[in-house]
Every structure is written in structure tokens, then in C-alpha cells.
């Protein structure tokens, strides 16, 4: 299952979460404070090299990505049946 690292107050994260909800996409939520100071910070840096959110991890395909529009496009192409 895909994992989404996000912050509640981040507008780009909200955009991704709303899109996932509208598309009916199931995901593991890795919520953190807006200022990434939580235990997820080290995990984010280890996975992707920076502590930016939103950050998507797709363990089935070995993919990690940043950027809300890229995340939404990727999920549409790979998880939504036309």
C-alpha cells in the first residue's frame, strides 16, 4: 500500500489528501507537524534526501516522490482504473 508523509497545515498536502479521497485511494497516512521536527524527519531524509512534504512512497514499485501534482498524476496513472 502507498504511504503519504504529510502535514495537516500544508496546502500542498491537503491537495494530495483531497485528491486521494476523491479518487477513493487507500493509503497509509504518516502525518507530522507542519514544522517537520517529529520522528518522521529522519525517516524522510533517509528515504528521499530531504524533509519536504508531501512525500509519497510506493513500496510495491520501489518509488519515492515529492511534489503534489506529480504525486496525484502518478496515483491516477497507476492506481485508478479508467
Regions found by a protein language model. Give the residues of each.
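GST-like domain detector, emphasizing the conserved glutathione-binding G-site
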Residues: 2-8, 14-82
Amino acid at each position: 500500500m502507498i504511504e503519504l508523509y504529510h502535514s495537516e497545515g500544508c496546502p500542498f498536502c491537503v491537495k494530495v489528501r483531497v485528491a486521494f479521497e476523491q479518487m477513493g485511494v487507500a493509503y497509509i497516512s504518516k502525518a507530522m507537524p507542519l514544522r517537520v521536527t517529529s520522528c518522521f524527519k529522519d525517516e524522510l531524509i533517509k528515504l528521499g534526501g530531504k524533509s519536504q512534504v508531501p512525500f509519497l512512497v510506493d513500496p510495491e514499485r520501489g518509488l519515492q516522490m515529492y511534489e503534489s501534482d506529480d504525486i496525484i498524476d502518478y496515483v491516477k496513472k497507476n492506481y485508478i482504473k479508467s
